[in-house]
C-alpha cells in the first residue's frame, strides 16, 4: 500500500503513533481517534501494538497515494504485536481482534498454497491494473519468511514521486525498482513495449527535469502538502517534529473548516537544489 507505516501503542495512560524511525508522529497521533476506538482497544489490550499504514493525499510525508483514497487519509491495519517482545500475534487471532474492535485493515485475500500460482497471478495483474502496490504473503507458521510482491506500476509511481529529489535517495532505491519492474514484466510474459518504456522513462526523467530547470533558474525545489488535524496545538507539535527530523518545512496557511484544522505547508528540498546548482555552475563531480 502506498502510504507510511505506523506503530500504535499505549504508553502509560496515552496512546501514540510511532513512525518507522521510532519518532512519535504528532499528525498520526492526532488522527488516531478517527480510525478506530483506540480507548476501548488499548484499555482491554494494553500489552499490544497495532501496526498499519496511513495512506491518502493529505498526509505530511508521502506524495504517493492509493487510488481508493481520494481525500484526507485512512488507516489500514496489517499486524498486531506484543510490546517488549518480538512476538507477532498469529494471523487468525489477529483477524479476530481486527473484527472485534472494528479496526480497518488492508484487503485480505485468504489462504493460498504453491498450487494457487495462477490465481495469485490474476490478483497481481488486477492490482497492477488498478494502481495498487502489490501483495504481502504472510506465513501461517510464524518461523517461515514473509514475502512482499510489488507491481510494475508501483515501481514507476515510487520513482515518479521521488526522482525530483533523486540526489537525496540512495542509488539502490531506484535500481531496485527498475529491476522489480523488469522482473514483473518477465514473470507475466509481458512485452518490453513503448508503453512500458515511456512509463519508466517519464517516471525517472520528467520530475528530475523539472527540478533541474528550477535549480538552474535559481528557484528553490519544493514539495507542497495539505493535512487535516483535530487539535490546533498539534500543528505546532508537527512542525517541532519536522525540525527534530531536520525537515525544512514552512507553514503556508491554517484554517478551521468544520471539525478539522486544514493546514498547508511547503518542504524546501535544499539538498537537491544545492547539488544540482553546483553541477549546473560547473563544479566537477566524479562517477
Predicted feature residues:
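Core nucleotide-handling region used for phosphoryl-transfer chemistry
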Residues: 1-5, 9-287
Amino acid at each position: 500500500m502506498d502510504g507510511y507505516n505506523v506503530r500504535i501503542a499505549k504508553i502509560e495512560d496515552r496512546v501514540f503513533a510511532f513512525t518507522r524511525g521510532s519518532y512519535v508522529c504528532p499528525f498520526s497521533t492526532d488522527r488516531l481517534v478517527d480510525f478506530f476506538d483506540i480507548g476501548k482497544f488499548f484499555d482491554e489490550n494494553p500489552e499490544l501494538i497495532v501496526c498499519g499504514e496511513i495512506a491518502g493525499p493529505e498526509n505530511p510525508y508521502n506524495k504517493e497515494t492509493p487510488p481508493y483514497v481520494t481525500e484526507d487519509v485512512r488507516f489500514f491495519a496489517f499486524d498486531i504485536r506484543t510490546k517488549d517482545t518480538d512476538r507477532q500475534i498469529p494471523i487468525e487471532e489477529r483477524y479476530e481482534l481486527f473484527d472485534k474492535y472494528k479496526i480497518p485493515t488492508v484487503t485480505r485475500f485468504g489462504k493460498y498454497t504453491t498450487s494457487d500460482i495462477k490465481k495469485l497471478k490474476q490478483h497481481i495483474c488486477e492490482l497492477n491494473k488498478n494502481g495498487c502496490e502489490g501483495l504481502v504473503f504472510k506465513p501461517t507458521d510464524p518461523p517461515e519468511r514473509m514475502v512482499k510482491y510489488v507491481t510494475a506500476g508501483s515501481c514507476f509511481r515510487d520513482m515518479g514521486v521521488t526522482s525530483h529529489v533523486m540526489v537525496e535517495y540512495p542509488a539502490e532505491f531506484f535500481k531496485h525498482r527498475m529491476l522489480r519492474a523488469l522482473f514483473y514484466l518477465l514473470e507475466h510474459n509481458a512485452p518490453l513495449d513503448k508503453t512500458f518504456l515511456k512509463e519508466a522513462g517519464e517516471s525517472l526523467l520528467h520530475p528530475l527535469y523539472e527540478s533541474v530547470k528550477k535549480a538552474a533558474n535559481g528557484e528553490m525545489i519544493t514539495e507542497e502538502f495539505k493535512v487535516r488535524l483535530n487539535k490546533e496545538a498539534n500543528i505546532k507539535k508537527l512542525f517541532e517534529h519536522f525540525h527534530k527530523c531536520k525537515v525544512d518545512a514552512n507553514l503556508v496557511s491554517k484554517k478551521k473548516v468544520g471539525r478539522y484544522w486544514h493546514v498547508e505547508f511547503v518542504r524546501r528540498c535544499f539538498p537537491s537544489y544545492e547539488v544540482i546548482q553546483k553541477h549546473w555552475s560547473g563544479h566537477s563531480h566524479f562517477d
